[in-house]
Amino acid sequence: MVRKTAPNGPLKTNLGSSFENPNSLKNLDPCANLRNVLIDNGVTIEVLNGLEEKVQKQIDEAFKIARNGLPPKPTFTAKRPLDIQKPEHIFENNQKDLTMLEAMRESLRHQLSISHDTILLGQDIEDPKGDVFGLTRTLSSNFPKRVRNSALAENTILGVSTGLALAGKKPIAFMQFSDFLPVAYNHLLSEIGAMYWRSNGQWNAPVTVMAIAGGYRPGLGPYHAQTLESICAHIPGIDVFMPSTAEDAAGLLNAISESNSPSLFLFPKSLINDRSRMTNSDISNHYVPIGKAKVSRVGQDLTIVSWGSPMPLCEKAGEVFYEAGINIEVIDLRTIFPWDIDCVLNSVNKTKKLVVVHEDNQTCGMGAEIIAQITELTDSSIITKRITRPDTYIPYDYSAQIEVLPSFKKIMEACSKMLNAEISWEKEDINQSGLLNVKAIGSSPSDETVNITELFVSEGDIVKDGQLLASVEADKSSMEISSPASGKIEE
């Protein structure tokens, strides 16, 4: 750290420093201190003088080249060109035994095993915790020097990772939640993302940043439920991803590892343990090309584009419309930036109708960007619609959270209107059978199991509304469950 000894601007005043004698800080010059440390550790003054002369000559030569050279030409992309990518490959078999969380863990394990340059850095990622959601569990035990806990400082995590990348390592930096990315946004925008462009391709900072994102889980609220992919995609030099299946998560992580490009990998907390979206254990051979979308359902009547948590809702809508004789094409974008314009454009040229669904808030979201570019590129008139989170924050109350986020109902109603189709809803009568199921949910977004520690009622008991039924213990907390209505306990 270099302490401030003068004002930032050209004014000759000491107003920029609170020290009475700024000259007293000159002995804190890190270059001078490093020179002294090297001398104390046996490096001769002659060697240091020779090194300084060599560096000075390099600076002088660079200055001459810059002064005498032609004016620089503008460049219109900040990204490092992608190397030739392999075709998409997911070995198909009927043995789907890994969730998204498990598949990502095995991809990280594979990367650690094949490259000693791979280093994982983040808050609480070492065992026994192995990340808030257990993503890195067992990895620090298997690779103790290369899976390391960090300080509780996102900017420090990315700063250290940038240095490691510039030194030839392959750092993977973990943000506990995507909501904390803004703390380190300047480092993403001005350092990691800009490094290749600033150095005219001489330097590159291939840092992979991983962050769990999104809502659709209890115990969240405004600090742990955002996705923020639009502000991340606004960074010119970073690739941004958000998968919705275990196979795509592993395939993209493997592709990112081979790309040698700065990458931000967002993964949806609502799907990390979804057993309907699992993959097989051949993780090392999973590969999903960067920038390639996936058509998860083929159709010709309307196009739905989405990514992350809303994807299962979009696919369910496609199934329901199919039963009514309407064929919806559903596209999983997978890569947010650079996104697959050709795939979406080809679909919209066929269907003439485009719906984009995302849980990020609406204004300046990716939905607006996708619709704008497709509208500019298509030769025909199209109808478009966005289904997003309104420009508001995500509430703590779970039912209110679900109302704010894109839902199956919102998707069905928007598509029906575009297709001039009628839709009606039947409200389930929970009192029709006389039974009311009491559901237990965790109080934390990382809770996956809820165990009953003490049951206060028995079968046949008569209970009142609000009466205590049980004490339960989730992964991160203990709580009590009360009866939502008066009645008789049945098993």
Per-range role (PLM):
Residues 149, 242, 330-332, 386, ...:
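A structural preference for short, hydrophobic beta-strand core positions in alpha/beta folds
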Residues 127-128, 153, 179-180, 309-310, ...:
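Glycine-/small-residue-rich active-site loops that bind phosphorylated ligands and cofactors
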Residues 153-158, 245-249, 334-340, 445, ...:
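Short acidic loop-to-helix transition motifs that present clustered carboxylates
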Residues 1-61, 68, 78-271, ...:
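Thiamine diphosphate
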Residues 426-471, 480, 486:
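Acidic, low-complexity mobile loops and tails
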Residues 57-91:
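Terminal amphipathic helices with adjacent charged low-complexity linkers/tails
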